[in-house]
């Protein structure tokens, strides 16, 4: 027999984050979720190609992106913000070669790093 106990948390009266920063963190949160999806697509490609080492590399990236997203989720909630979930666009699923996958992953990482830098600039 399992007993479920619900704990009601009182809504925060004071938001400890600006609307602009909340919106920017939510945007980045959703980019991290897309990145997770994108790298999962890349892992799937390598699985289909029989390249399990490369597949595993991208599965590790999948977990890392989820970890980043969840840090933002917790931060927004701790600061009285509200997490918004946007639709996740379908990532590219067909690749010409392993080299193309790594080139795309590198370009994507540069993009996401730039977004993080912009977020830091906004926060300070």
Question: Where do the PLM segments sit?
Answer:
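Iron-associated oxidoreductase/ferritin-like identity signal
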Residues: 1-124
